[in-house]
């Protein structure tokens, strides 16, 4: 049985409410130059079967040798997930036949994984924060790739991925909606990228998700789960969960029974389809790999890796709120990518943190999203954006001119201060010039003057006209003060 669920997360069926229960198995490719048990390269994009050693091809007599860096990356990830690091773990053979698995088994970890229980804090769009338990993290080999579209009657096998190190990160069934699942994968990917243990590139297959979905009436025992294999985008994860939950609800409300099975998500049809019956652990006949000794990790190794860990998203977010006075939402947006957080800090250094966050989130991120660029490709450097903020702060330019200046720097580059001088963008602070513009507008609009005196909110119209008359260069505070004095508005 379980605690009451948030009604907003329930799914409406024809015969009442249902709760969806979701667990995730994330396969994250370890960032390393060579494979888990061989010295073959892990470089992406090589010609088929170029990055294959005799070990990867399972040639007789070839023995696996553990890659120390892959072990270190798994431990770093465990530390980043606030998880237990197991001092002793065992590699097992997971036996099954598939053409792209040349050994006839996969080297994985079953009963004794390298990392035990941990947790991930996940911020949801509506402001709620949930804790998602991590059940385990284990190391295993990736399989090769079967290609069925190269020839009308033949299939081919590419073993470049065979033997590449994967971390399988298994969550507890703590997720209760498609949105929660998407937010969880997004946060997990952020942590991996901060740590440098996986690049999280789903398009290249470096991060893949198996999604376990079941439904139940609120408060009842867990239902029968189905596993949706190899979902390769966060958007598809959400769609797959919603489609599978609806399928199961329809079956149960029709009096049917859910069969435990493995399914695939078809994004074109927006539905899941049966792949095979779900295997149990005994189907794989796990047993310890006789070619590999148990993996033993001492405290000194773990402590050394701890000292090298970067500041992680949750800690960085808390610091941004405390140090720069940011809202929790703005801090969450800024720490979503390590490069974005670093960019913000470079802009905010020695400046007003809230102003820096406003410019980075609204102006820079808005333009980057519009152009389809990442922060690494920004044509406006942190130094340039900081200079624009300085020009506003010291009264050289107005906020409106600053946006025009941002566009110039984005399109043409250059030093913001030099651009202001060369293009005559300095704001007008000469009260005589501003007063002349104000007097002219008041004289030309006597009806508006009467209306503004009766309804002070119309002062904004006069401000706009004055800014227009001065090419946006008038100091807004000076314009406001003059207009209030001349119109007799307090």
Curated annotation (Swiss-Prot):
InterPro entries for the chain? Asn/Gln-tRNA_amidoTrfase_suB/E (IPR017959), Asn/Gln-tRNA_Trfase_suB/E_cat (IPR006075), Asn/Gln_amidotransferase (IPR018027), Asn/Gln_tRNA_amidoTrase-B-like (IPR003789), GatB (IPR004413), GatB_C_1 (IPR042114), GatB_Yqey_C_2 (IPR023168), Gln-tRNA_amidoTrfase_suB_CS (IPR017958)
A Pfam family of this chain: GatB_Yqey
Enzyme nomenclature, EC number: 6.3.5.-
GO BP, sorted A to Z: glutaminyl-tRNAGln biosynthesis via transamidation; translation
* Keyword tags: ATP-binding, Ligase, Nucleotide-binding, Protein biosynthesis
Top EC category: ligase
Q: What does this protein do?
A: Allows the formation of correctly charged Asn-tRNA(Asn) or Gln-tRNA(Gln) through the transamidation of misacylated Asp-tRNA(Asn) or Glu-tRNA(Gln) in organisms which lack either or both of asparaginyl-tRNA or glutaminyl-tRNA synthetases. The reaction takes place in the presence of glutamine and ATP through an activated phospho-Asp-tRNA(Asn) or phospho-Glu-tRNA(Gln).
Q: Which family does it belong to?
A: Belongs to the GatB/GatE family. GatB subfamily.
Q: How does it assemble?
A: Heterotrimer of A, B and C subunits.
Q: NCBIfam families per the record? A: gatB (TIGR00133), PRK05477.1-2 (NF004012), PRK05477.1-4 (NF004014), PRK05477.1-5 (NF004015)
Protein name as it appears in the record: Aspartyl/glutamyl-tRNA(Asn/Gln) amidotransferase subunit B
Q: Which organism is it from?
A: Methylobacterium nodulans (strain LMG 21967 / CNCM I-2342 / ORS 2060)
């Amino acid at each position: 049985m379980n605690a009451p669920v948030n009604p907003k997360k329930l799914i409406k069926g024809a015969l009442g409410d249902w709760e969806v229960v979701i667990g995730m198995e994330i396969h994250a490719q370890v960032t390393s130059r060579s494979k888990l048990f061989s010295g073959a390269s892990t470089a992406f994009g090589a010609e088929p079967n170029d990055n294959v050693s005799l070990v990867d091809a399972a040639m007789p007599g070839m023995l696996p040798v553990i890659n120390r860096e892959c072990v270190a990356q798994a431990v770093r990830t465990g530390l980043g997930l606030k998880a237990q690091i197991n001092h002793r773990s065992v590699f097992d053979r997971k036996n099954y036949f598939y053409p792209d698995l040349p050994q006839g088994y996969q080297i994985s970890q079953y009963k004794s994984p390298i990392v035990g229980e941990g947790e991930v804090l996940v911020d949801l769009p509506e402001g709620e924060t949930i804790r998602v338990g991590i059940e385990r993290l284990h190391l295993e080999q990736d399989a090769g790739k079967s290609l069925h579209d190269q020839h009308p009657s033949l299939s081919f096998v590419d073993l470049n991925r065979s033997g590449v190190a994967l971390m399988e990160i298994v969550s507890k069934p703590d997720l209760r909606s498609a949105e929660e699942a998407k937010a969880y994968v997004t946060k997990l990917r952020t942590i991996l990228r901060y740590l440098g243990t996986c690049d999280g590139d789903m398009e290249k297959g470096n991060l893949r998700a198996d999604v376990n979905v079941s439904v139940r009436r609120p408060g009842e025992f867990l239902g029968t789960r189905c596993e949706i294999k190899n979902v390769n985008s966060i958007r598809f994860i959400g769609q797959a969960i919603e489609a599978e939950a609806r399928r199961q609800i329809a079956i149960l409300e029709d009096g049917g029974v859910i069969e435990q099975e493995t399914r695939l998500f078809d994004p074109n049809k927006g539905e899941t389809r049966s792949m095979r019956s779900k295997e149990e652990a005994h189907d794989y006949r796990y047993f310890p790999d006789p070619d590999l000794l148990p993996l033993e990790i001492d405290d000194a190794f773990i402590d050394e890796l701890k000292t090298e860990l970067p500041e992680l998203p949750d800690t960085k977010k808390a610091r941004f709120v405390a140090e720069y006075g940011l809202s929790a939402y703005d801090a969450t947006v800024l720490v979503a990518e390590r490069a974005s957080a670093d960019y913000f800090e470079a802009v905010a250094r020695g400046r007003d943190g809230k102003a820096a966050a406003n410019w980075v989130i609204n102006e820079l991120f808005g333009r980057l999203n519009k152009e389809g660029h990442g922060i690494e490709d920004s044509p406006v450097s942190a130094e340039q954006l900081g200079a624009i903020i300085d020009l506003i702060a010291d009264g050289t330019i107005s906020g409106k001119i600053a946006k025009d200046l941002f566009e110039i720097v984005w399109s043409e580059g250059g030093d913001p201060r030099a651009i202001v001088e060369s293009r005559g963008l300095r704001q007008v602070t000469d009260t005589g010039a501003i007063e002349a513009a104000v007097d002219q507008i008041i004289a030309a609009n006597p009806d508006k003057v009467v209306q503004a005196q009766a309804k002070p909110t119309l002062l904004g119209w006069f401000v706009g006209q004055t800014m227009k008359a001065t090419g946006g260069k008038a100091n807004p505070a000076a314009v406001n003060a003059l207009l209030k004095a001349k119109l007799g508005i307090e």
